UniProtKB/Swiss-Prot annotation:
Pfam families: ATP-synt_B. Keywords: ATP synthesis, CF(0), Chloroplast, Hydrogen ion transport, Ion transport, Membrane, Plastid, Thylakoid, Transmembrane, Transmembrane helix, Transport. In plastids the F-type ATPase is also known as CF(1)CF(0). This is ATP synthase subunit b, chloroplastic. The keyword Thylakoid applies. The chain crosses the membrane at residues 26-44. F-type ATPases have 2 components, F(1) - the catalytic core - and F(0) - the membrane proton channel. F(1) has five subunits: alpha(3), beta(3), gamma(1), delta(1), epsilon(1). F(0) has four main subunits: a(1), b(1), b'(1) and c(10-14). The alpha and beta chains form an alternating ring which encloses part of the gamma chain. F(1) is attached to F(0) by a central stalk formed by the gamma and epsilon chains, while a peripheral stalk is formed by the delta, b and b' chains. Belongs to the ATPase B chain family. Its main location: plastid. GO terms for cellular component: chloroplast thylakoid membrane; proton-transporting ATP synthase complex. It comes from Chara vulgaris. It comes from the Eukaryota. One of its GO terms (molecular function) is proton-transporting ATP synthase activity, rotational mechanism. It is found in: Plastid, Chloroplast thylakoid membrane.
Length: 186
């Protein structure tokens, strides 16, 4: 049976040789094994680790550059937005001032137009009143003249006799001939 043990574990024949080998159990490793493992890792893994670290470094640097570029872009956009905001505020203030000025101008124009229209209406009213007064006066004159003429006719008809009519006709004929002779002598 001891041969079976030697076949299964060849190190058991050599007691000193049984202690040489890699012990991968971290708790049981000794300093030499750690040195060998670390040395092997440093020798063979140096390039791999260096490449990984360089790639990681490039990724980080690119990320930083991108972040700085985005920061600069954002800063520039913020500055542009602030400039645009200032322009908009200035324009809004300018529009507000122009609006106030325009309102004052239009207010004065409306007051002037209302005053002018009021004066024009007053003049039109006065003209209409004057024309109505003239029309009424003319109508009163006609009425008075008509009444006076009717009264005169009534008086004349009452006083006018045939003798008086003959005397008046003779008087008018004499007056006409006298005027006619004066105008022919000239």
């Amino acid at each position: 049976m001891s041969e079976i043990i030697h076949v299964i574990n060849p190190m058991s024949k050599w007691p000193l040789a049984s202690q040489f080998g890699f012990n991968l159990d971290i708790l049981e490793t000794n300093l030499i094994n750690l040195g060998v493992v670390i040395g092997t890792l440093l020798y063979f893994g140096n390039e791999v680790i260096s490449n990984l670290l360089n790639k990681r470094k490039e990724i980080i640097l690119n990320s930083i550059r991108d972040a700085e570029q985005r920061y600069e872009d954002a800063t520039e956009k913020l500055k542009q937005a602030n400039r645009d905001l200032e322009k908009a505020k200035f324009k809004a203030n300018e529009i507000r001032i122009q609006g106030s000025t325009q309102i004052e101008i239009e207010k004065k124009e409306l007051i002037y137009a209302a005053d002018r229209d009021s004066k024009h209406l007053e003049e039109s009213k006065n003209i209409a009143i004057h024309l109505e007064e003239q029309r009424i006066l003319e109508e009163v004159r006609r009425e008075v003249s008509g009444l006076a003429f009717q009264k005169t006719l009534i008086i004349l008809n009452n006083r006018l006799t045939s003798q008086l009519q003959v005397e008046m006709i003779d008087y008018k004929i004499d007056l006409f001939f006298n005027n006619f002779q004066v105008s022919t002598n000239l």
